[in-house]
A protein has these predicted regions:
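Alpha-helix N-cap and loop-to-helix initiation/capping positions
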Residues: 39, 110-117, 146-157, 184-196
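Metal-dependent enolase-superfamily TIM-barrel catalytic cores that perform enediolate-based chemistry
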Residues: 115-132, 139, 148-166
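Alpha/beta enzyme core
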Residues: 123-128, 161, 167-168, 191-212
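Conserved small/polar residues in nucleotide/adenosyl-binding loops
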Residues: 218-225
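Non-cysteine beta-strand/loop elements that form the S-adenosyl-L-methionine
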Residues: 93-95, 133-138, 214-215
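Glycine-rich, proline-tolerant flexible connector loops at the mouths of alpha/beta enzymes
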Residues: 70-72, 137-148, 181-183
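Conserved, mostly hydrophobic/aromatic
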Residues: 40, 135, 174, 216
């Protein structure tokens, strides 16, 4: 069993889940200000510390996805945030993409960016304690979308990301998210989602990814009104 496979299995062991605590500062600001709390680095840290120190963390959470700000912070008792998470038995992870941008020659669709400088960032995240990462591709469903261009572009980016992550000794979470917005049927969503995931794995294989050290995160097909 490879070390990457051991990490992947530990994240999902005993029916545990992954806590997504990788909200951007903008998203955290909206959440905190909605309850009249100032969105300062200290308050964002306190919010996340409250999650990580909950009694149910040890029993329910196998991995925690962090935001760049958070993985660099120190808890109120002097521990690094990754150490605080590791003490619960969970594995620290980090979101590494830099967001979805308009896809050239198909402006209604998105392609996720963040490959530039990723190898260097991954080295730093590993030193900080991260052992898995996340990258999210986004796809719209309409009569004409997702296009082959969007499917291929995002699959290629996910594979290149995965190769760099495994090179750095971490497990990549591959998230090809087919958005639920629209008027599509469950059947249409199933067809599009299957096409997206199939292409992702074709690219992962081309890039010689160790599939036993990959976690797939996807949206279950569903109809929308």
């Amino acid at each position: 069993m490879s070390e990457l496979n051991k990490i992947a299995l530990k994240i999902l062991s005993n029916g545990k889940g992954i806590l997504a605590a990788d909200e951007s500062n903008g998203t955290m600001t909206k959440r905190l200000e909605s309850v009249n709390i100032q969105s300062s680095p200290e308050n964002r840290l306190l919010f996340r510390e409250t999650l990580f120190e909950a009694d149910s963390m040890r029993d329910c959470i196998g991995g925690v996805i962090l935001y760049d700000e958070t993985i660099n912070q120190i808890s109120n008792d002097g521990k690094t945030i990754p150490s605080l998470i590791s003490d619960t038995g969970a594995i620290p992870g980090i979101k590494v993409d830099t967001g979805a941008k308009n896809l050239a020659n198909s402006s209604e669709e998105k392609v996720t960016e963040g490959l530039d400088g990723l190898r260097e960032r991954l080295k730093r995240y590993y030193q900080l304690g991260a052992r898995f990462t996340k990258w999210r591709g986004v796809y719209n469903i309409t009569e004409n979308y997702p296009s082959k261009l969007a499917i291929n572009s995002n699959a290629h980016a996910l594979a290149r990301y995965s190769a760099l992550v495994q090179e750095g000794g971490m497990v990549p979470i591959v998230e090809p998210e087919v958005l639920m917005d629209g008027e599509h049927s469950a059947e249409d969503c199933l067809i599009k989602t299957s096409e997206v995931i199939k292409k992702c794995f074709e690219e992962l294989i081309i890039h010689k990814i160790d599939l036993s050290g990959v976690c797939l995160l996807y949206t279950s097909p569903s109809p929308r009104d």
